[in-house]
Amino acid sequence: MARVKRGFKARRRRNKVLKLAKGYRGARSKLFRSATEAVDRALNYAFRDRRVKKRDFRSLWITRINAASRLNGLSYSKFIFGLKKANVEIDRKVLADIAVSDPKGFSEIAGVARASI
C-alpha cells in the first residue's frame, strides 16, 4: 500500500483547536500543545459552570423572594409553605421577578400565602 502522510487531516485537527484558542494570551493561542491544554480546561470549566449557573440563579431567586416576603411579614419558608397550601403554582423564577418588578402584586401573593397558613 502507498504511504499516507496525514498532512491534511492533522492540519485540520490542529486548526480546529487553534481556532477555539483564539484570543488566549501568549503561546496558548499559537502553539498546538499549549492551546490543547488551555482549550480542554476551558471546555471543562464551561461544562461545569453551565450546571453551576442553574444553582446560582436558584439561590438568587430565593434570596430575592426571602427579602420581599420579609418586607411583608413572612419568612421565606413560611411564604413557600403558604403558597403550597393555597395551591399556588408559581415557580421561584417568576416569584423573584414579581418581587423585583411589582412589589404590590407580590404583597397580594404574600397575603394569599398568609391566609392559608
From Swiss-Prot:
Keyword Calcium: yes or no? no
- InterPro entries noted in UniProt: Ribosomal_bL20 (IPR005813), RIBOSOMAL_L20_CS (IPR049946), Ribosomal_protein_bL20_C (IPR035566)
Q: Name one GO molecular function term.
A: structural constituent of ribosome
**UniProt entry tagged with the keyword RNA-binding:** yes
Which GO CC terms are listed, alphabetically?
A: ribonucleoprotein complex; ribosome
Which Gene3D superfamilies did the record assign?
A: 6.10.160.10, Ribosomal protein L20
What PROSITE patterns does its record include?
RIBOSOMAL_L20 (PS00937)
Question: What are the protein's UniProt keywords?
Answer: Ribonucleoprotein, Ribosomal protein, RNA-binding, rRNA-binding
In its UniProt record, which GO terms are filed under biological process? ribosomal large subunit assembly; translation
> What Pfam families does the entry give?
Ribosomal_L20 (PF00453)
Main function:
Binds directly to 23S ribosomal RNA and is necessary for the in vitro assembly process of the 50S ribosomal subunit. It is not involved in the protein synthesizing functions of that subunit.
Recorded family membership: Belongs to the bacterial ribosomal protein bL20 family.
Protein name, per record: Large ribosomal subunit protein bL20
What is the source species?
A: Pelobacter propionicus (strain DSM 2379 / NBRC 103807 / OttBd1)
